[in-house]
């Protein structure tokens, strides 16, 4: 099952590869994503543990997933989705609303409307964050852009069923790791913002500076729970390997933002538990 949103740094396309390195089924009963984002890896996992916790500090992303798990909120969200039109003008207005309207966690209707506007802006933007997306390819006798959005809307009921038992929170991801890291029945998949030393620009609404990355690494190194981390290789993360984490590298084929240039990137995984797979790069 694919994520309902496109997300910078999201792992939809790598999910099956990453899942190969998950701990054995039954070796944990609580699964946590402290930097939830698109939740792309978990949505591809056929082995669902008893407890799943999705967390994201971004109010827009949190609002969407909070709405998707709640029965009443989802029903209202679906009503809005059924009336949708694919419009650059609507996208511009919704984007402005997301900037100007204060986040109110105590107002369910407000969260639903924020969730819908974020969903709309995301699905009508190139790669979820660029300009208005117009794809001239034809699918189902319409623009591929419209077809993709309608397909996502049609899949929302199944997505709601899948997410209905997920616990959704809106807090600092590092604090969440710290809260659960000493429990041996917990497995944390951490996909934090790429370290700033590995990129030239900021595309995250909620980023992490070098000090926060150090705190994140501290908590991971001292954890008793199972942890799997994904990201780009960098000097700061060498401390993970120095403290017993296994590192795995694999090449990811991506397209540039304009969909014209192919790029190969090397993604890394770090884990503090043993894996049966042999392609381990120490």
Would you name each region that the model predicts?
Residues 1-35, 40-41, 47, 260:
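S-adenosyl-L-methionine
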Residues 1-17, 24, 70-189, 193-201:
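SAM-dependent nucleic-acid methyltransferase catalytic core
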Residues 28, 146, 171, 175, ...:
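Residues lining hydrophobic/aromatic ligand-binding pockets adjacent to catalytic sites
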Residues 36-40, 154-156, 231-235, 274:
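Short, polar loop motifs at secondary-structure junctions
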Residues 50-55:
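Short beta-strand element of Class I
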Residues 58:
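Conserved SAM/SAH-binding beta-strand->alpha-helix loop
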Residues 62:
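Short alpha-helix immediately C-terminal to the canonical SAM-binding loop
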Residues 206-282:
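Long, positively charged, glycine-interspersed low-complexity recognition regions
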């Amino acid at each position: 099952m694919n994520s309902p949103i496109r997300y910078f740094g999201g792992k939809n396309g790598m999910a099956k590869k990453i899942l190969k390195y998950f701990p054995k089924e039954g070796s944990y009963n609580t699964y946590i994503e402290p930097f939830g984002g698109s939740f792309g890896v978990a949505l591809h996992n056929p082995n669902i543990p008893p407890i799943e916790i999705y967390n994201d500090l971004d109010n827009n992303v949190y609002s969407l997933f909070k709405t998707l798990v709640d029965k009443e909120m989802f029903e209202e969200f679906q009503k809005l989705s059924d009336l949708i039109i694919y419009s650059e003008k609507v996208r511009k207005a919704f984007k402005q609303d997301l900037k100007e309207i204060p986040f109110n966690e105590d107002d369910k209707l407000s969260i639903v409307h924020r969730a819908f506007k974020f969903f709309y802006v995301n699905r009508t933007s190139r790669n979820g964050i660029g300009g208005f997306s117009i794809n001239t390819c034809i699918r189902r006798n319409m623009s591929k852009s419209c077809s993709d959005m309608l397909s996502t809307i049609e899949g929302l009921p199944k997505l709601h069923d899948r997410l209905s038992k997920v616990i959704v929170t809106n807090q600092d991801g590092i604090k969440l790791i710290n809260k659960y890291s000493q429990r041996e029945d917990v497995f944390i998949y951490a996909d934090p913002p790429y370290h700033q030393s590995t990129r030239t620009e900021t595309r995250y609404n909620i980023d992490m500076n070098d000090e926060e990355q150090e705190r994140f690494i501290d908590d991971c190194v001292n954890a008793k729970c199972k942890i799997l981390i994904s990201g780009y290789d960098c000097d700061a993360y060498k401390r993970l390997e120095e403290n017993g984490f296994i590192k795995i590298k694999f090449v990811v084929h991506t397209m540039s933002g304009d969909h014209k240039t192919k790029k190969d990137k090397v993604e890394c995984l770090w884990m503090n538990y043993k894996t049966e797979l042999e392609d381990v790069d120490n």
